[in-house]
Amino acid sequence: MGALQWLSITAAAASAVSALTPEQMIGAPRRTEVIPNPSGDTGLFSTSQWSFDTHSESTWWSLIDLESGETTTLTDDSDIEEIIWLGSDSSTLLYINSTNAQVPGGVELWIADSSDFANYKAASLSAGFLGIKSTVTDSGDVHFILRGKSYPNGTAYNDQLAETYPSTARIYDSIFVRHWDTYLTTASHAVFSGTLQSSTSDDGNVQYTSSGGLTNLVNPVKGAESPFPPFGGNDDYDLSPDGKWVTFKSKAPELPLANNTAAYVYLVPHDGSATAFAVNGPDSPATPEGVEGESNNPVFSPDSDKIAYFQMATNTYESDRNVLYVYSIADDTITPLAKDWDRSPSSVTWVDGDNLVVASQDLGRTRLFAIPGDAGTTSSPRTFTDGGSVSAQYVLSNSTLLVTSSAFWTSWSVYTASPDEGVINTLASANEIDPELSGLSSSDFEEFYFDGNWTTLQGWITYPQDFDSSKKYPLAFLIHGGPEDAWADEWNLKWHSKVFADQGYVVVQPNPTGSTGFGQQLTDAIQLNWTAGAAYDDLTKAWQYVHDTYDFIDTDNGVAAGPSFGAFMITWIQGDDFGRKFKALVSHDGPFIGDAWVETDELWFVEHEFNGTFWQARDAFHNTDPSGPSRVLAYSTPQLVIHSDKDYRIPVANGIGLFNTLQERGVPSRFLNFPDEDHWVTGQENSLVWYQQVLGWINRYSGVGGSNPDAIALEDTVNPVVDLNP
């Protein structure tokens, strides 16, 4: 275990960088949200950092003083999976050790003191578990819950001890076959509960030891699963503060998983003495009429009497508007709060027994909003934060919250705020700590507004290092995915606009029709409208606005790039006159052939977007097919195509098909493939190659490669290039 070490994180980094490079951005420390102790004077977080010298990652845990911002290194034990505060004692920690000396593939629970990390083992668990939550009950015992995989009979599934078969065959009688990056198996995910019994030694110290086994709280509900992979996690379940109840979210077990988004919030005793009941399911008298979409983020009130959660109205629509509901356990009633508010919040925190705070996308940021417990249907929640994007918020005292956020210019910011005072005290910001990020400033980024196809739209501009408005910089035009998504004021490891800009570009990121955080009407308008009207027209109008407004942007030598839906738009642009406005194009994991959507994993998505299956809505599928012969004949702009083997949302054949077509049309093109990545590229070494190839490609054709001696080139990648042409 590492010794405690003091580090000031409020002083500015010693040296400034001339530009943000991919190596600096990827290799900078990555910190988690800060979790306060019960007294609210100390926070806990972890940090990981990749080294391109050793090609390895280091991880350590730290404490931060919530008055001064000073931090201490708590431990650098790489076997520790996660740590939480235990009970009302502000110095006791409970953590999961990722190894188990007695059970291969198992984990252990340990108790430690935050002052010196003196520790002892409290329990041995027979499988891999994550996401522990706990509370100390009136008896002094610890009730806890955690998540893991489960056999169909409800017992915990251990990957290392699971039965193997002579054949590798997979056999399916229903969909899903695969999801995101994984083929589904008979093992599912579940929330388990357990108890640590307390005892007091002769010297007065309290110790905790395992009491009994674990109880699977999800398995008794046939077909239920929680959390649901790949994006389900700790926010999908909660433990009541009194330790008596557990709530969890599960997709509707009676509906086909690949075709539906409907999900319910369940309530179950911690000891599993009764089967979990869906409080807003079809059998509940409390279920609001006409509300049939996905539920998420169930959270108990401080008095354990209520559950706050979000739910969408429409089944099959993953980007419908979240509405905040409160379920009363005693009354078996559900009450909506601020039901008509035109935002879609994503996380909720109880400030006290009645009042709540939610985080929601709002005009290209994620802000905090206060919602009183008696908020009526037409109530308009009030925001009390501004720039950046909140990732976590915890109540300290007197309605003060500890907030973790990020922004374009900082990967991690920690501050206190309250609904009455707004931001109170900034404790830490990564760009003032990390040498890799020093020199980044909010002044490098600004928003702009332009007239789109049918409404005023927002976008972002990122300036290069040492920007001079008297000079001209090639345009880098980035199109976001989704399409129900948005470019936001947040740290983006996959598409960081400043990394693009510091090659010598002015980066423009428009938020067209379909974008989120600007009202539900803008989001909903993308349905059946990918190319025939608003969304595509919005992008051309954004380009024209930039061309007409900013003398320092060189649109003659511009480039365009985008992921997923953005990649679809890139290829659609390739087949249109608009494609000739750009010197180079980059498409990452985009669809190419319209009918190939039948291969996707989440069928609910495409069947909602195009209003039917591919045989019911043939015109909609064909009208958004960039591989149509007339479009292919127009292909001429150099294009980099990126697609990875484990992308089951938009399978890799789409990328190979596009590359084949470009090659046969004689268009300068390259195919970049990662066999171990999915719809996103997240591995650090792979991410570096991704940036090298993307930036090298656009630099070659925009002229930046010739004007900037430090510009990245395609040849910077050490991997060999396969070229079988004679």
From Swiss-Prot:
Keywords of the record: Aminopeptidase, Glycoprotein, Hydrolase, Protease, Secreted, Serine protease, Signal
Record's subcellular location: Secreted
Annotated EC: 3.4.14.-
Gene it is expressed from: dpp5
GO molecular function terms attached to this record: aminopeptidase activity; serine-type endopeptidase activity
Biological process (GO), any one: proteolysis
List of glycosylated residues: N97, N153, N259, N398, N453, N529, N611
Family according to the record: Belongs to the peptidase S9C family.
Organism: Aspergillus niger
Secreted keyword on record: yes
InterPro entries tied to this protein: 6-blade_b-propeller_TolB-like (IPR011042), AB_hydrolase_fold (IPR029058), Peptidase_S9_cat (IPR001375)
Primary localization: secreted
Recorded GO CC terms: extracellular region
Signal peptide: 1-19
Record function comment: Extracellular dipeptidyl-peptidase which removes N-terminal dipeptides sequentially from polypeptides having unsubstituted N-termini.
Protein name: Probable dipeptidyl-peptidase 5
Annotated active site: S564 (charge relay system), D647 (charge relay system), H679 (charge relay system)
